[in-house]
């Protein structure tokens, strides 16, 4: 996670978006933006520069992969969210502690990362990729998408549906 020593470079689609990002960072105490990619990712791509991406998957596809024993699901929500409800068989590692927990994660498995809707899991997937995990997917819609499909959950008050 970013702190006062983190080098910050922004990717923004125009001046207004850049100003909003700088203001948002300042509100949380980060005021040392080192550079801006003002024409966004498209400008970067137009220059022929390399782009990294994170694979995505749906909740439905994740459920199928789990049934086939093909993936390890990684829940990066807060502990209280995990205790309330979680996907059966998922591993829990809070995104804020993920870098220190990397040795606990399976490097030889496909990993599907999720949070509640997809924001924190995007950050977590980026952390994993940056640290050499190559088989990483971000589950679109997170646990909210999983619930909407009526897929099983564990936790207090959750009625786990039959497999």
Please tell me what each predicted stretch does:
Residues 1-72, 76-163:
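Rhodanese-like catalytic fold shared by cysteine-dependent sulfurtransferases
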């Amino acid at each position: 996670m970013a702190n006062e020593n983190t080098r910050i470079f922004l990717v923004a689609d125009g001046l207004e978006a850049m100003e909003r990002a700088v203001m948002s960072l300042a509100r949380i105490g980060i005021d040392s933006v080192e550079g801006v990619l003002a024409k966004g990712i498209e400008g970067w791509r137009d220059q022929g520069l390399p782009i990294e991406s994170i694979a995505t998957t749906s909740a439905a596809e994740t459920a199928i992969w789990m049934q086939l024993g093909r993936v390890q699901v990684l829940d990066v929500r807060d502990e209280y969210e995990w205790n309330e409800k979680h996907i059966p068989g998922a591993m829990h590692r809070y995104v804020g502690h993920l870098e220190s927990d990397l040795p606990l994660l399976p490097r030889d498995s496909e990993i599907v990362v999720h949070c509640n809707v997809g924001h924190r899991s995007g950050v977590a997937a980026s952390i994993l990729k940056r640290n050499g995990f190559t088989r990483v997917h971000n589950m679109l819609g997170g646990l909210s998408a999983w619930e909407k499909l009526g897929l099983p959950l564990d936790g207090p008050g959750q009625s786990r549906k039959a497999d």
